[in-house]
Amino acid sequence: PVLMIATYGENDKVDVMNMAWGGICDNNMVALNISEGHKTAKNIKERGAFTLSIADIDHLEESDFFGTASGNNMEDKFERTGMHAIKSTRVDAPIIEEYPLTLECRVSELQHESYGFRVLGEIVNVISDEKILDESGKVDPTKLNAFVFDQFQNGYYKISYTIKNFYSINLKIFL
């Protein structure tokens, strides 16, 4: 899904970036592959923390704006969207209230590679809106109203239903 990185800049100014490359890379870790020129990269280096939210269709316009406007050139980028942020009590980063699922993350490693800049973050907490949970209290992906970005067509596509459960598809091959 499309992921939104939220950080604090100078004077606790909220900055949000739409991330194209990255995601969960271990049970309690995320990987962000971003350009070091982004304001978000600078903020992550200075603060050592960020939040990572799943964007939903209800906030597609704002999420797309966060991916096209630069915090380096637009000081009121976050404010223009009308969205709201609260300070995390666990990490030095903002939580965007409108997004239904947010991972609070602490930087564990910064990697400078030939292909770019990678941030590895430890997930220290997960915040989810009750409306996206199933009867057992687990996140129901169909209730997230999430979308993905297709780099071939530059389009956003809704994630809508389960096609098959993991580990149930190829059981015949194992037998």
Residue ranges and their predicted role:
Residues P1-L175:
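Basic, polyanion-binding surface patches
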